[in-house]
Protein backbone atom coordinates (compact mmCIF):
# COMPACT_ATOMS: atom_id res chain seq x y z
CA UNK A 1 0.00 0.00 0.00
CA UNK A 2 1.37 3.42 -0.94
CA UNK A 3 1.64 6.35 1.44
CA UNK A 4 0.32 8.83 -1.08
CA UNK A 5 -3.01 9.37 -2.78
CA UNK A 6 -4.27 11.00 -5.95
CA UNK A 7 -7.07 13.53 -5.60
CA UNK A 8 -9.55 12.64 -8.38
CA UNK A 9 -10.73 16.25 -8.74
CA UNK A 10 -7.28 17.68 -9.43
CA UNK A 11 -5.40 14.51 -10.44
CA UNK A 12 -2.62 15.74 -8.16
CA UNK A 13 -0.27 13.67 -6.06
CA UNK A 14 -0.98 14.31 -2.38
CA UNK A 15 1.48 13.38 0.33
CA UNK A 16 -0.31 13.13 3.63
CA UNK A 17 0.63 11.74 6.99
CA UNK A 18 4.02 10.49 5.85
CA UNK A 19 6.10 12.12 8.57
CA UNK A 20 5.29 10.92 12.07
CA UNK A 21 4.85 13.67 14.66
CA UNK A 22 8.02 12.59 16.46
CA UNK A 23 10.11 12.39 13.27
CA UNK A 24 11.93 14.93 11.14
CA UNK A 25 11.44 13.37 7.72
CA UNK A 26 10.46 10.27 5.79
CA UNK A 27 11.90 8.88 2.57
CA UNK A 28 9.71 6.85 0.29
CA UNK A 29 11.19 4.88 -2.60
CA UNK A 30 9.18 5.48 -5.76
CA UNK A 31 11.52 3.83 -8.26
CA UNK A 32 14.36 1.40 -7.59
CA UNK A 33 15.86 -0.50 -10.52
CA UNK A 34 19.27 -1.69 -11.67
CA UNK A 35 20.08 0.58 -14.61
CA UNK A 36 22.39 -0.52 -17.41
CA UNK A 37 21.84 2.47 -19.71
CA UNK A 38 23.77 5.14 -17.79
CA UNK A 39 26.73 6.77 -19.55
CA UNK A 40 30.01 5.08 -18.70
CA UNK A 41 32.21 8.04 -19.60
CA UNK A 42 34.18 9.79 -16.88
CA UNK A 43 31.62 12.61 -16.95
CA UNK A 44 27.86 12.74 -17.32
CA UNK A 45 25.48 15.67 -17.63
CA UNK A 46 22.71 15.59 -15.01
CA UNK A 47 19.61 17.72 -15.38
CA UNK A 48 16.52 17.96 -13.18
CA UNK A 49 13.51 19.67 -14.76
CA UNK A 50 10.00 20.66 -13.80
CA UNK A 51 7.81 20.36 -16.90
CA UNK A 52 4.20 21.23 -17.57
CA UNK A 53 2.05 20.07 -20.46
CA UNK A 54 -1.15 22.06 -20.96
CA UNK A 55 -4.56 20.35 -21.28
CA UNK A 56 -5.10 18.78 -24.68
CA UNK A 57 -1.59 19.66 -25.87
CA UNK A 58 1.13 17.45 -27.34
CA UNK A 59 4.90 17.87 -27.09
CA UNK A 60 7.04 17.73 -30.22
CA UNK A 61 8.49 14.49 -31.55
CA UNK A 62 11.88 13.82 -29.99
CA UNK A 63 14.41 11.25 -28.83
CA UNK A 64 16.35 11.07 -25.57
CA UNK A 65 20.12 10.75 -25.81
CA UNK A 66 20.43 9.33 -22.30
CA UNK A 67 18.34 7.89 -19.53
CA UNK A 68 15.45 9.96 -18.17
CA UNK A 69 13.12 9.29 -15.26
CA UNK A 70 9.86 11.15 -14.67
CA UNK A 71 7.65 11.54 -11.61
CA UNK A 72 4.17 12.70 -12.61
CA UNK A 73 2.98 15.10 -9.92
CA UNK A 74 -0.32 16.22 -11.44
CA UNK A 75 -2.56 15.15 -14.29
CA UNK A 76 -2.26 12.40 -16.87
CA UNK A 77 0.15 11.79 -19.74
CA UNK A 78 0.05 9.43 -22.71
CA UNK A 79 3.32 8.63 -24.50
CA UNK A 80 2.89 7.91 -28.20
CA UNK A 81 5.30 5.60 -30.01
CA UNK A 82 5.17 3.97 -33.44
CA UNK A 83 3.99 0.63 -32.04
CA UNK A 84 2.32 1.44 -28.70
CA UNK A 85 0.98 3.99 -26.26
CA UNK A 86 1.85 4.14 -22.57
CA UNK A 87 -0.38 5.89 -20.02
CA UNK A 88 0.55 7.47 -16.71
CA UNK A 89 -1.33 9.26 -13.92
CA UNK A 90 -0.34 11.47 -10.99
CA UNK A 91 1.88 9.49 -8.63
CA UNK A 92 3.44 7.32 -11.35
CA UNK A 93 7.21 7.19 -11.83
CA UNK A 94 8.46 5.98 -15.21
CA UNK A 95 11.36 6.03 -17.63
CA UNK A 96 11.40 6.68 -21.37
CA UNK A 97 13.60 4.77 -23.83
CA UNK A 98 16.85 6.10 -25.23
CA UNK A 99 16.93 6.81 -28.97
CA UNK A 100 13.27 5.97 -29.66
CA UNK A 101 11.10 8.58 -31.40
CA UNK A 102 8.08 9.51 -29.29
CA UNK A 103 6.01 12.38 -27.95
CA UNK A 104 3.98 13.10 -24.84
CA UNK A 105 0.30 14.06 -24.95
CA UNK A 106 -1.94 15.40 -22.19
CA UNK A 107 -5.40 14.05 -23.03
CA UNK A 108 -7.14 15.76 -20.10
CA UNK A 109 -9.40 18.63 -21.23
CA UNK A 110 -8.87 20.81 -18.12
CA UNK A 111 -5.85 19.81 -16.00
CA UNK A 112 -2.24 20.61 -16.94
CA UNK A 113 0.18 17.74 -16.34
CA UNK A 114 3.16 18.54 -14.08
CA UNK A 115 6.27 16.34 -14.05
CA UNK A 116 9.71 16.31 -12.51
CA UNK A 117 12.33 14.83 -14.83
CA UNK A 118 15.78 13.54 -13.89
CA UNK A 119 18.07 13.24 -16.93
CA UNK A 120 21.51 11.63 -17.20
CA UNK A 121 23.31 12.02 -20.53
CA UNK A 122 26.90 11.74 -21.74
CA UNK A 123 28.57 15.13 -21.24
CA UNK A 124 29.04 15.76 -24.98
CA UNK A 125 25.38 15.21 -25.95
CA UNK A 126 22.17 17.18 -25.54
CA UNK A 127 19.50 15.57 -23.38
CA UNK A 128 16.89 15.76 -26.14
CA UNK A 129 17.05 15.87 -29.93
CA UNK A 130 13.93 17.19 -31.65
CA UNK A 131 13.03 15.23 -34.79
CA UNK A 132 10.90 15.86 -37.85
CA UNK A 133 7.42 14.41 -37.47
CA UNK A 134 7.53 10.78 -38.57
CA UNK A 135 5.61 9.59 -41.61
CA UNK A 136 3.96 6.79 -39.62
CA UNK A 137 0.82 7.30 -37.57
CA UNK A 138 1.37 6.68 -33.84
CA UNK A 139 -0.71 4.25 -31.86
CA UNK A 140 -3.15 6.55 -30.06
CA UNK A 141 -5.07 4.61 -27.46
CA UNK A 142 -7.25 6.61 -25.04
CA UNK A 143 -5.97 7.13 -21.51
CA UNK A 144 -7.79 4.65 -19.21
CA UNK A 145 -8.82 7.38 -16.75
CA UNK A 146 -10.81 9.15 -19.48
CA UNK A 147 -12.54 6.21 -20.97
Please place each PLM-identified region on the residue numbering:
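Ligand-binding loop in jelly-roll beta-barrel domains
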Residues: 78, 98-126
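A short beta-loop-beta micro-motif enriched in histidine and acidic residues
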Residues: 43-44, 55-69
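A short, N-terminal "cap"/entry segment at the start of jelly-roll beta-barrel domains
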Residues: 1-45, 131-147
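Extracellular/periplasmic catalytic domains that process cell-envelope and extracellular macromolecules
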Residues: 40-41, 63, 71, 107-112
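Short acidic-glycine-tyrosine-enriched beta hairpin
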Residues: 53, 82-101
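Extracytoplasmic low-complexity repetitive segments enriched in small/polar residues
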Residues: 36, 93, 115, 119, ...
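Conserved hydrophobic/aromatic beta-strand scaffold that supports enzyme active sites
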Residues: 48-52, 69, 93-95, 117
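Glycine- and acidic-residue-biased ligand/ion/polar-headgroup-sensing regions
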Residues: 65-83, 92
